[in-house]
Amino acid sequence: LAKRKAGGEEEDGEWRPPATQKRQKAGSEAESADCYRSPFRKPLTQLTNRPLCLDSSQHEAFIRSILSKPFKVPIPNYKGPTGLRALGIKRAGLRSPLHDPFEEGALVLYEPPLLSAHEQLKIDKDKVPVHVVVDPVLSRVLRPHQREGVKFLWDCVTSRRIPGSHGCIMADEMGLGKTLQCITLMWTLLRQSPDCKPEIEKAMVVSPSSLVRNWYNEVEKWLGGRIQPLAIDGGSKEEIDRKLVGSMNQRGLRVPSPILIISYETFRLHAEALQKGSVGLVICDEGHRLKNSENQTYQALNSLNTPRRVLISGTPIQNDLLEYFSLVHFVNSGILGTAQEFKRHFELPILKGRDADASEAERQKGEERLKELISIVNRCLIRRTSDILSKYLPVKIEQVVCCRLTPLQAELYKNFLKQAKPVEELKEGKINVSSLSSITSLKKLCNHPALIYDKCVEEEEGFMGALDLFPAGYSTKSVEPQLSGKMLVLDYILAVTKSTSNDKVVLVSNYTQTLDLFEKLCRNRRYLYVRLDGTMSIKKRAKVVERFNSPSSPEFIFMLSSKAGGCGLNLIGANRLVMFDPDWNPANDEQAMARVWRDGQKKTCYIYRLLSTGTIEEKIFQRQTHKKALSSCVVDEEQDVERHFSLGELKELFSLNETTISDTHDKIKCRRCVNGHQVRPPPEGSDCTSDLSQWNHCADKRGLQDSVLKAAWDAAVTFTFHHHSHEEQRGIP
């Protein structure tokens, strides 16, 4: 060990601080100056450029000397200014796209023209267009038809399909992923363009109120945390106005919530606030709501300041030519001219050519104008059918089940036909639209006599003395399935399904009163159920659907009011669906039936469409399936019946055929059946989208594929049409 000197220096001359005296406790002896120090402690080294003792002025001077040293750029020979924000040298070169267009599986929406080496030298580097490539996060999950759809949408809204027009109609059938395609379009437009900057700053989705939360969830699902949508699904008028004004005032590249999701009703009520700003793109879900250009919603949306419009409609565009015009005019104003020009150039010649008394020249002119119209519309409309789904989804078996009326229903039905005024008026050749509300009474009677019991008690028109027909002691407090043919069949279907499988069932009806009966039946049978109708809040709907779809959920039945937003709901937790009553508009029934057979479904799906044999329900169903010419249109409400039915057809509505096993089968004059029994199978290649005459026809249960319906046959089934979506599952789900 080095010997230490008294002054704090060692023999080798190294400096160390002198020893300091520690404060001693009172009463203790002071230590000597030469106190013991550990020989292992390393001595401190003095800073050569720092004074030994610093006063405040010296300290300040020392800090200033450090800060005043010039900043040295860590790049050799760099002579540029150091005060700019840019770090390092800006490298000259062409701009690059956001995602690699040459990566395997890349979905390229725009490919810039190739530049020669000479052109690359001459062109302004900041003006060279770049590839527009869909984010790989989305392109990896898009199916082939969806990739094609996204390309079509992008071409339309960027005016590449129709110069000067920026709109299109996405009319794919239900279940083909229209929502995902539109989310992909929005995300691409919000992030990139050929000009190497976002094409739009903001997008807006307008949908039925029941789908606002669904859209929000879908954006979250596919984009994760990459974007924060704003969904307006509740709150006071002032609160909603404040949110909307704030959203419309947002501008720039970094808008906090670039996607606004709002319902048609809220949009209409707050149109003034929304029209103060501009939006890069508006998407209208369930766009067939805009088929009437006179209604307030159409006009409010049409006045929104937006160049790009996409209209989604899974429902086939109805056969009314004016609906064609309204929808196309909304997305691409002017491509079909004004309403008057459209009527003169297209509608009148086409309708005249369709007339039974048209001359050959008129017929030919009508066909030419129709082809011209279709060629224009097809430039901004894309439609694919659900046939594509057969590659990805399990088999769907669709069944139209005719159920005989019970004796009570038959007596009440005949009693009504004898008394009701519409029947008398029709015999005299008169049509009173207001009296046609009695159609609703007949439809409810077909569901269950309990639904018209109050009318019988009050002896309303058509139900005089009908109370005597009910069994003694009858009460509406308890459901009695044996009093309704359809309810009896439903009771069997539910019981057999519950006892033989772990399948779940969706029950759909047009009437909330019928849902009340379903509830009573479920309570009697101790089935767990959930119910969605117009009284349920939007937020609660989303939670109920999510819970029902969970495999661990104990609910067996999901009750759905078709009027309360059946469209857009994803109910893949169930694989059996019962349409308890038909709707005048086939689109409504199609919407409801598409709830279970859609992306994510793993089980074979069974659809049951129940009809009361020989009644008004079969007439409504025939109306749905009958292929009409362009001049006819679909009945939306019962008040419109007079406009769509001839006197003879109306007379037929008010009739009951008690001897038939299926009035619908009688009407199609089937050549494959002998004495009601099918002797030849359906044509090869036919499926459940084919005409009803090409389905399987069963007058007994021998030809049925569904074991559940076989077990329920003897309850009250008289006849069944059935067919499948495809032979077997193809491809991978």
Swiss-Prot record:
Domain Helicase C-terminal intervals: 488-642
EC number(s) on file: 3.6.4.-
Record CDD domains: DEXHc_RAD54A (cd18067), SF2_C_SNF (cd18793)
Primary residence: nucleus
Mod. after translation: Acetylated. Acetylation promotes interaction with BRD9, and subsequently with RAD54, which is essential for homologous recombination (HR).
Region called Disordered, residue ranges: 1-35
Presence of the UniProt keyword Membrane in the record: no
Keywords (A to Z) from UniProt: Acetylation, ATP-binding, DNA damage, DNA repair, DNA-binding, Helicase, Hydrolase, Metal-binding, Nucleotide-binding, Nucleus, Phosphoprotein, Zinc
Function summary: Plays an essential role in homologous recombination (HR) which is a major pathway for repairing DNA double-strand breaks (DSBs), single-stranded DNA (ssDNA) gaps, and stalled or collapsed replication forks. Acts as a molecular motor during the homology search and guides RAD51 ssDNA along a donor dsDNA thereby changing the homology search from the diffusion-based mechanism to a motor-guided mechanism. Plays also an essential role in RAD51-mediated synaptic complex formation which consists of three strands encased in a protein filament formed once homology is recognized.
GO molecular function, one term: ATP binding
RNA-binding found in the keyword field: no
PTM-bearing positions, type N6-acetyllysine: K504
Tissue: Highly expressed in bursa, thymus, testis, and ovary. Low level of expression seen in all other organs tested.
GO CC, one annotated term: nucleus
Record protein name field: DNA repair and recombination protein RAD54-like
Quaternary structure and interacting proteins, as annotated: Homohexamer. Interacts (via N-terminus) with RAD51. Interacts with NAP1L1. Interacts with BRD9; this interaction orchestrates RAD51-RAD54 complex formation.
A Pfam family it matches: Helicase_C
First-level EC class: hydrolase
Modified residues (Phosphoserine): S561
UniProt record, GO biological process: double-strand break repair via synthesis-dependent strand annealing; reciprocal meiotic recombination
Residues the record lists as binding ATP: D172, E173, M174, G175, L176, G177, K178, T179
Record-linked InterPro entries: Helicase_ATP-bd, Helicase_C-like, P-loop_NTPase, SNF2-like_sf, SNF2/RAD54-like_C, SNF2_N, SNF2_RAD54_helicase_repair
Subcellular location field: Nucleus
Gene source species: Gallus gallus
Family: Belongs to the SNF2/RAD54 helicase family.
Top-rank taxon, per record: Eukaryota
Domain Helicase ATP-binding: 159-334
